[in-house]
Amino acid sequence: MSSTPSNQNIIPLIKKESIVSLFEKGTRQDGRKLTDYRPLSITLDYAKKADGSALVKLGTTMVLAGTKLEIDKPYEDTPNQGNLIVNVELLPLAYETFEPGPPDENAIELARVVDRSLRDSKALDLTKLVIEPGKSVWTVWLDVYVLDYGGNVLDACTLASVAALHNTKVYKVEQDSNGFRVNKNEVVGKLPLNHPVVTVSIAKVDKYLIVDPDLDEESIMDTKVSFSYTPDLKIVGIQKSGKGSMSLQDIDQAENTARLVAVKLLEELKKQLGI
């Protein structure tokens, strides 16, 4: 079973004291302010064999998301909606404690949070993925791979997922005596993405709240809270991780900070996606 670096790494006390001493001065090891995000870059259409893909680099954290569309049956409780299935894998090359094999509880949690943020925000209009109501719909497989774990992988997974969905091609559907089939030679459009969604994570280290923690900062954090936002700044997901606790005042302060960061992050995401 894999362990995330924040659970596995033990930074020597002297290094923690050094990091916290920088927080006292309002700065960090990489020169950022406490509320600054690391540099973000998004490369679209990175995996040519996928129907849509995006490579996200957030500092040293690197995540690849890819999509595949296939004709399928709708779920019984949502006969007039397409299906979205999110998977996350922590690849062994991403960090020394990650092991090969089926997704562990950390990967499953990441997938669940990303899935919930996409669904609750209605970022993807699943009703427009219906081919024949109650019988045939598009199933969107969204596979997310953590290639390099440099901290704050959840935010990067959300960014990569949204970018890959935005970049996903929809092919022509043809019908014959055997039913529906996909004509991969003809693209009819892209996935009906209503709007982007972003996740902003805030870590608490001693008395300090820091945005977008890197690997060292996650290794010494007490706890972390992540907020997912739509462009109108509606909260569509909250996730706490880490063994420590946050007071109501901490949570309120963290959300106020995350909201301000989300505005800038959404602008940057839209810019890089060209929307």
Swiss-Prot record:
Keywords of this entry: Cytoplasm, Exosome
GO cellular component, one term: cytoplasmic exosome (RNase complex)
Main location group: cytoplasm
Keyword Cell division recorded: no
Location in or out of the cell: Cytoplasm
Organism domain of life: Archaea
Gene Ontology molecular-function annotations: mRNA 3'-UTR AU-rich region binding
Gene Ontology process terms (BP): rRNA catabolic process
Entries under HAMAP family matching the protein: Exosome_Rrp42
Family, similarity comment: Belongs to the RNase PH family. Rrp42 subfamily.
Function: Non-catalytic component of the exosome, which is a complex involved in RNA degradation. Contributes to the structuring of the Rrp41 active site.
Summary of subunit composition and partner proteins: Component of the archaeal exosome complex. Forms a hexameric ring-like arrangement composed of 3 Rrp41-Rrp42 heterodimers. The hexameric ring associates with a trimer of Rrp4 and/or Csl4 subunits.
Name used for this protein in its record: Exosome complex component Rrp42
Organism for this UniProt entry: Saccharolobus islandicus (strain M.14.25 / Kamchatka #1) (Sulfolobus islandicus)
